[in-house]
Regions:
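Interfacial loop-to-transmembrane-helix boundary motif in multi-pass membrane proteins
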Residues: 33-39, 87-97, 131-176
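N-terminal hydrophobic segments of proteins, predominantly signal-anchor/transmembrane helices
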Residues: 33-53, 66-128, 155, 390, ...
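Helix-loop-helix junctions and helix-breaking kinks within/between transmembrane helices
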Residues: 51-64, 112-121, 201-208, 234-270, ...
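Transmembrane alpha-helices of multi-pass inner-membrane enzymes
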Residues: 69-72, 277, 397-410, 414-464, ...
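A membrane-periplasm/extracellular boundary helix in multi-pass inner-membrane enzymes
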Residues: 103, 158-168, 253, 270-309, ...
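Alpha-helical transmembrane segments of multi-pass inner-membrane proteins
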Residues: 146-179, 184-253, 259-271
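Long extracytoplasmic/lumenal interhelical loops at the membrane interface
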Residues: 298-378
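Hydrophobic transmembrane alpha-helices and their immediate junctions
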Residues: 371-408, 439-443
């Protein structure tokens, strides 16, 4: 072992006894970090609240990421290159799917202009948003990006809660946002039945955003804990509290799939962390819910009646969509391309569908199933990218568990990566920002020379070795990258 390696080991041993504090985004001046945090929040707010707002025919949610990526790429070139390098595997996946989608669309007979527009609006936009979020988050720091995300989505959730309580001002505010985006109110079923959606484009979009808000908060908490205390198997009470808030917000949207995903996450989390107190909380909570069930149901059914029903057309139509989507895939395994609309093909299958309850859903809606939608968009060729996807999930490691509510939710809706969901790229980009664990400088003291047998090499010269150790303990070497950090895909 070399002298430098032995000296570095001495430094690590000495630093273990020192207090640890988080230093997130501290490499940049405060004003730079504050400006980046504001930019991240504005960019996210445009995607959440005004996704269809256009300027000169171009959507604002596309203008902001392009502009901010260009600005921060010029001002912080090194950070931009680092973000590009960190996201290279995910960017390669987006590029591969763009090529596959374009090829499938061409083979299906889609016009070239439509193919180009679809590739730009789906894959290129996803790549730009991902890089913009990653670069800005590297400047602002992970914590600031998380706070901005929770603030933007939290505002929409609060407005949705007021809408659930039938506060007219909350509905008027949403109507104003709809007019700004030229959203036809008479064409939205959600406005007809006054289903709460906050300031998001739809209740489904808000539910998707809530799952991602929970995911980024819980993953960031886990990331910080690992950076300060190392890999831990203990549960985090803050995550459980966040889950309860998440459940309450989902009640406002009257969307069932995120709640189902939340309970599945809770079971998996309790099992992996061996947290008996979570199990006891579930038991006592279930007992309390049983005793308060009549009052609880009366309250919920008066505000969100669909939440407690499993026999409505929305639930029954899921079987229709699953059967219809599977039939479409089996009849054309090569796929239908990026502009595929399943409700354009229902007549061929109507003889098999019309006897099913809520069969008319196939005439009017998309498949409401993320997996089947992807298979029909890209065809069986998408299976070639499964190894890349598995590697990305493996790189994410223990943080994948916090996305369980998101995964469960998109299975039942027209939402997900590359399918009506831009916010996922903000979350992935933000979580790729480094969490740096800095150790306070140890006492400046001279180390006694080690014996040769301790390092398997020549004895260290006393004065030279001590000087080398003190050099390693200088501020230049005062930062250790936590092993448990979120590895960028």
């Amino acid at each position: 072992m070399t002298v430098a390696t032995a000296s570095r080991m001495d430094f690590v041993r000495a630093g273990r006894a020192q207090p640890v504090h988080l230093d997130i985004g501290r490499d940049h001046p405060f004003l730079h970090r504050a400006f980046a945090a504001v930019c991240f929040g504005v960019m996210l707010a445009g995607a959440v609240m005004l996704p269809a707002f256009t300027v000169a025919g171009v959507q604002m949610r596309a203008i902001l990421p392009v502009g901010l990526l260009t600005l921060f790429g010029i001002l912080y070139t090194n950070e931009a290159w680092a973000a590009l390098h960190g996201q290279r595997l995910l960017l390669a996946l987006l590029g591969g799917l763009a090529i596959l989608g374009a090829f499938v669309s061409y083979m299906y007979g889609t016009p070239a202009n439509d193919i180009l527009f679809a590739v730009v609006s789906i894959h290129v936009q996803a790549a730009v948003v991902l890089l913009a979020a990653a670069v800005v988050a590297r400047i602002s720091g992970l914590r600031a990006a998380v706070i901005a995300t929770l603030a933007v989505i939290g505002v929409s959730a609060v407005v949705a809660t007021l809408q659930m309580l039938d506060v007219s001002a909350a509905w008027s505010l949403r109507t104003t946002f709809a007019h700004m985006q030229h959203q036809a109110l008479d064409e939205l079923e959600f406005f007809g039945n006054r289903r709460p959606m906050g300031l998001s484009f739809s209740p489904i979009q808000l539910a998707t955003q809530l799952t991602l808000a929970f995911a980024i908060f819980a993953a960031a908490r886990e990331k910080e804990r690992r950076a300060t205390t190392g890999v831990t198997k203990t549960s985090d009470p803050a995550v459980i509290l966040a889950l309860l808030v998440f459940f309450a917000a989902c009640l406002a949207t009257a969307t069932r799939s995120p709640i189902l995903g939340g309970f599945i996450f809770l079971a998996v989390y309790a099992a992996l962390r061996r947290a008996w107190w979570i199990a006891m909380t579930i038991i006592f909570g279930s007992l309390l819910a049983y005793l308060a069930w009549p009052l609880l149901m009366e309250t919920i059914q008066s505000t969100s009646p669909r939440l407690t029903r499993t026999d409505d057309n929305s639930a029954a139509a899921r079987l229709v969509f699953a059967y219809y989507g599977l039939r479409l895939f089996l009849d054309n395994p090569l796929g239908y391309g990026l502009v595929f609309q399943p409700y354009d093909l229902w007549t061929k299958y109507w003889t098999d569908l019309y006897m099913m309850r809520a069969a008319h859903g196939a005439q009017e809606n998309d498949l409401h199933n993320y997996v089947l939608s992807m298979l029909n968009f890209y065809g069986i060729g998408i299976l070639l990218f499964v190894p890349v996807l598995m590697r990305l999930l493996r790189n994410a490691g223990a943080y994948v568990i916090f996305f369980i509510p998101y995964f469960i939710h998109i299975v039942f809706h027209n939402s997900g990566p590359l399918d009506n969901d831009t916010i996922i790229w903000f979350v992935i980009g933000a979580l790729s920002a480094n969490v740096v664990a800095r150790r306070k400088p140890a006492r400046r003291r001279r180390f006694a020379p080690r014996e040769p047998s301790q390092y398997g090499g020549p004895a260290l010269a006393g004065a030279g070795a001590s000087a080398n150790r003190l050099r390693l303990m200088s501020p230049r070497y005062g930062s250790l990258q936590a092993r448990g950090g979120f590895r960028a895909p």
